[in-house]
């Protein structure tokens, strides 16, 4: 009989206990099923970068590659992806204590956009503060260029702002 093979990709361990929980579950499963193959990937990110990793994992698995090769190539791919984001609101970060409620309110009232990234350690880091979307979008493109982006797969997500996502897509296509 064929042994079980499982793969899990979690949100960054710097923001959530999902990775630790998945690793604990992996260890328990392997104790009961010693021949099983289970890989757990700490994305060190969230959102669209997490989706890129999942898509690569699915693509490699669909090719029928051996488990170890899928795992190794996915881990290598993760070194070539990056998360950049622009936040219009810091409400959720204030709710979970990551920023003060006063700072979150000021960002909203002043129309400040926070441009940031996921660090190599999986924490969210601010890169810039901009007044409005018109300044934030070019900042995102500039940071993509600084990170060495030369075209390729990009995932754009939005939270109830499809118009802004569409504008960014147009600017992205024009740049690359």
What is the meaning of each model-derived region?
Residues 1-19:
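N-terminal glycine-rich phosphate/adenylate-binding segment common to multiple enzyme folds
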Residues 7, 18, 22-27, 33-39, ...:
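Mixed-charge interfacial surface used for oligomerization/domain docking
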